[in-house]
Structures are given as structure tokens and as C-alpha cells.
A protein has these predicted regions:
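Positively charged, small/polar-rich N-terminal and surface patches that mediate targeting and assembly
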Residues: 1-109
């Protein structure tokens, strides 16, 4: 593998937005897989007020080599002024799965 595998978390306001972003990430090879997890509640401070919103979580499997493009593309597609985009390195995992992530992100073979 030529770069670190990552899991990226991104929350969305609804299922349709989440699926649109997920499909774009996979179609553009910025992610090998995106899990769309509905039914979350986020509690946060925004403009001095405590907010509580239903959200949908994207769990994006990708590589550090394409992360800058993935982050920029999420900003292009996401309706939030400050979308949650958090990338975490995958420290260990199934070698076959990690190789699959590498094979399905970046330039097509």
C-alpha cells in the first residue's frame, strides 16, 4: 500500500444528502466504501446556542493519498457551513480489506 488507510467521519442533515455524498465519493474513487448510518442525534454549540439535531453519519473508508481531494469534495457537496470531517488512521485491520481499500481508491487501474 502506498498510503495510510483512513476512516473518515462526516455527519449530514438527512439521508438524501448523505447518500448523494456517499455515492459521489465512491463514484469518484475518493472512497472504497461509505457506510451510511441514520438515526443519530448530535448535540453541539452553534453561534452561542446549544443545538440538538437528527443527523446521518457517513463512515468513509479511504487512503491518506486521496484525503485532500475527498475533504475538498465534501466541502463542495455539503450544505453545512462547517461540516464535520474527521479522519482517523486505521492502525490495524484485515490485510485483504485494507488492500481492497487501496485498490478501490485513487486513479483507476
Amino acid at each position: 500500500m502506498d498510503s495510510q488507510p483512513l476512516v473518515v467521519y462526516c455527519t449530514c442533515l438527512d439521508q438524501a444528502t448523505a447518500e448523494r455524498i456517499a455515492e459521489t465519493m465512491v463514484n469518484e474513487r475518493l472512497a472504497a466504501c461509505v457506510t451510511v448510518a441514520p438515526g443519530l442525534t448530535s448535540i453541539y454549540r452553534w453561534q452561542g446556542q446549544i443545538q440538538r439535531d437528527a443527523e446521518v453519519l457517513l463512515i468513509i473508508k479511504t487512503r491518506s493519498a486521496v484525503y485532500p481531494l475527498l475533504e475538498a469534495r465534501i466541502h463542495d457537496l455539503h450544505p453545512y457551513e462547517v461540516p464535520e470531517i474527521i479522519a482517523l488512521p486505521i492502525q490495524a485491520g484485515s490485510a485483504t480489506y485494507l488492500n481492497w481499500i487501496a485498490d478501490n481508491t485513487g486513479a483507476s487501474a
